[in-house]
Amino acid sequence: MPPPPHQKPENVLKRAHELIGVNQAPAALTLLHEHITSKRSRNVPIASLEPVMLLLVELSVEQKKGKLAKDALYQYKNIAQNTNVATIELVLKKFIELAAEKVTAAQAKADEVQSSIEATTSNIDDLEASETPESILLATVSGEQSRDRTDRAIVTPWLKFLWEAYRTVLDILRNNARLEVLYQSTAMQAFDFCLKYTRKTEFRRLCELLRNHVQTAAKYSAQMHAINLNDPDTLQRHLETRFQQLNVAVELELWQEAFRSVEDIHTLLSLSKRPAKNVMMANYYEKLTRIFLVGENYLFHAAAWARYYNLLRQSAALIASGHSKKADNPACSDADLQRAATFVILSALSIPVISTSRSRGAMVDFDEARKNKNSRLTHLLGMAQAPTRAGLFRDALSKSLLRRAQPQIRDLYNILEVDFHPLSICQKISPILAEIGADAEMQKYILPLQQVILTRLFQQLSQVYETVDLEFVESLAQFPEPFQVTRGTIEKFIMNGNKKGDLAIRMDHATGVLSFDADVFSSAKAVHAGSSAGSAESETGSVQRLQSTPSQIVRSQLTRLAEALYTTCRYIDPSFNEARIKARDEALARAKAGAEKEHQEVLARKEIIQTRKDKASEAQAQKEKENARKKLLQEQALQQAEAARLAEEQKLREAKRLANEREQIKRKEVEALLKDMKLEELQGEDIETLDSNKIRMIKLQQLEREKNSVAEKLRITGKRLDHLERAFRKEEAKKLPEDYAKQRERDLAAYERTKAQTLKEAELKHKADVELKHRLTRLMPFYESFRSDLHERRRDEFEKRRRDAEREMEKQINARRKEAREKRIREKREREERERQLREAEERAAREKEEERKRLEARREELQRLKEEKEKEREKLREIAARQQQREEEAMARRKAEKEKLAATPSAYRPPAAAERTEAAAPPRIALAGNRPSWREREAAKAASGETAAPAPAAAEPVAERPRAAAPPAERTEAAAPPRLALAGNRPSWREREAAKAASGGGNAAAVPERSAPPLRAAAPQRAGSGRPENDRDVPPAEPLKASGAPGKYVPKWRREGA
């Protein structure tokens, strides 16, 4: 069955509206979907497809047909992406807007349902009376109509549809540079959707989807319209999207996704060639602080706060110097800097002194994993090396952060790091902890601060006491409510420190005593391994030394002995000091020389590195520029080819459409014409068979009939109107005098009223004018005096202004004169310059013309000289030709004389001597193939053969008809005819051999006729003109020839037949 004919989009749209009008929306949606996905729709203009697509999107949203909409949108994108991107954006935006409107409507409907349920519940008067066993059972089985159930039934399906719409649109727009802006805006809308409706699962899927799109961008970078992450604008848009993703992840408290978003941002920042804005980086570090705080990674949390504070300082400096806009930088007022400095100090103080991880840090696998993780976090913060607790404090003190921090934080630092006293620590720190606990942001640091305080407490107690009561420790670790530390917390802290090897404390639960490690030979760790949550510091570096423990004394006795011996030698032996000082001076000199040399080498190496970096960057830039140029050219070529193809297809479609429209218009005109004519005889006839003549005749007949009908109607109507008009006038004549009298009375009354009103108004106006005149007459003297006084006062000012105006005019006149004079001078200079340039151009043209004339003259002289030389050569050639001709004439005369002598007295063949065959003026000619005689030789041969054959009749003397063939070799070897050389393959014929035998004295020499002589090869073409018969070889001679008697010789045919 053949496919159905393809319909136009306008007809499809009309049909869809008709189906919608009869409540057939699913059928309309199916019709539109089939039309869009049809292969024939690819050649339809986009302007006609756009309304179809908008209606399809609207119907698919109404009916929740997401898959149909997705299929149609993909097809529409493939059709329109190379011609019109705006229509794709319009359709996709419409799709998202309709889905969002449906979600909003569903939310409003759910609110209405819930409010009606609550109202119904509140209208019950007696709640106890309404509780029946049946209602209790029904409520138990079906459950209450709660808000969650209402949302699941009404809102959730539309939320799911909206989420699928976002996914569909993002998948359609991915990795297309022309649709990139809409892609980023849609991603932003999807983030807002997840944040507004708290869709955590969908947010994770959305992040993964965007991550996959970026990964596949490099894979399909060679495709047309692919995105280029090396483009700064594209990378900036991706960074903005990732920062929004990070913000939403933090708001939704999805810390794992937030950390992955941070890694994505760091990857994009490493690709970017332009630095990110400070406001974006401030947001980046601020979100990192929250992520690290939730993960209890206090070390990197403090490092992130330090980076945030440094960024605020840089932004404040840039804004103060005016090198950057305020909009590109975060808020960096004094309050913001104080807050950042406070949190830097507080977060650094919260870093644990010992490890708080439950895993053993001494294990190799855990150490390696920890190092890798710390390295990743260090790179995320943009730091050269991993941060430490001591390093953060040194950096904070060097930047005077304590002065910017809040006073209670400064006191807390002094108590914990400067003047730590275990017996009074809790009394001093309790008010500060209370203030910190009152602040919601600082309250999160109380628990790590307690861990730090307990660590300091146990480390210093271990230096003083060997055993201590647990109750005493509890009394020392008294914190304000609600931050009180219990015995269980202390025991847990001690067990964790012992497990990690950071503490050496034994607990006796029976007596409640804590015993510190007193083994003098125990090997305590000098530096403990840190964990991912903090960094352990050395005992000497972070804990105040109150007194040395016995184990420390035992471990340091050799060191102390060496120091005592060294001091003794230095005081007893003066030469020891001299040698030591001399060695130190020599070492200093060597170090100074080596430092200078190393400095120069470092500078040279730095210059080399910089030069190589510059060359590499230039090469990379050139390569990128070349790649971009090639890609641009390729894209332009593809676009031109695609545009040409589309233009050609559009042209063909337009021509076909116009032809169809002309045909339809013609058919409709014929149908309308026939319908207007109302011709009964043509109803059954095919319209296509009607020609213009027939239609014209039918039309003329119809017009004639209509004309006659109209004329008849006009005649009847005119006659009727004449009768009516005559009757009207007869009746009117009776009433005209009465009507005329009434009209005259009305006109006279109106005239009298108008006249009286006019006179009254004129009198009133005259009275008012007279009164005004009298009032003004009384004022005239005062007016005249005031005017004269005013003129007197203003005259001086007027004169002054007039003089100023005249001076200003004079100044302007002078300025204009000066300007005109300068203009004339400038024009004169320009005119002289132009004349000079014109004169130089004329002189240059004259020089060039003279040089050209000289070149032509020299060329003519050269041509004249060559012509004279050619003329001389031709003269020489003519002389040579004349001498040659003379020699030929002499040779011809000799040959003629010899022929006449031979014809008169025939004699035996005798070969000429070598001297006769070689002339001085004729070089030897080799008788090779193609070495034919010249035209002069042929003409001479013709003349000679003609002269010889003329006196002899053809029938009487057949032998004499071939004098040229019988001529001896001496006649054929003149000056113009070179002799034949005895070359390889050029053997003599039998005739030549016979003639040679006869000349050498053979017995049969006299019997050989002239015919036995070899023919002249050069005269072969003139054989037909020599008077010889065509087949004279078969004709017997006039005289019988005798056999030579030699065996194996040639016998002529006639001789063989005669025998």
Curated annotation (Swiss-Prot):
Does the entry feature the keyword Magnesium, yes or no?
no
Q: Name the Gene Ontology molecular function terms of this record.
A: mRNA binding; translation initiation factor activity
Q: Which GO terms describe its biological process?
A: formation of cytoplasmic translation initiation complex; translation reinitiation
Q: Where is the composition biased (Basic and acidic residues)?
A: 794-902
Keywords (alphabetical) are:
Coiled coil, Cytoplasm, Initiation factor, Protein biosynthesis, RNA-binding
Question: Region Disordered: start and end of each range?
Answer: 794-1059
Q: Where in the cell is it found?
A: Cytoplasm
Q: Which InterPro entries match?
A: EIF3A, eIF3a_PCI_TPR-like, PCI_dom
What broad class describes the main subcellular location of this protein?
cytoplasm
Q: Which residues form the PCI domain?
A: 337-521
Keyword rRNA-binding attached: no
**Could you tell me where the Low complexity compositional bias lies?**
908-927, 942-958, 965-988, 1005-1024
| Top-level taxon of origin | Eukaryota
Q: Which residues form a coiled coil?
A: 99-130, 586-905
Quaternary structure? Component of the eukaryotic translation initiation factor 3 (eIF-3) complex.
Family under the similarity heading: Belongs to the eIF-3 subunit A family.
Looking up HAMAP family in the UniProt record yields: eIF3a
Q: What is this protein called?
A: Eukaryotic translation initiation factor 3 subunit A
**Organism encoding this protein:** Neurospora crassa (strain ATCC 24698 / 74-OR23-1A / CBS 708.71 / DSM 1257 / FGSC 987)
The major lineage groups are: Eukaryota, Fungi, Dikarya, Ascomycota, Pezizomycotina
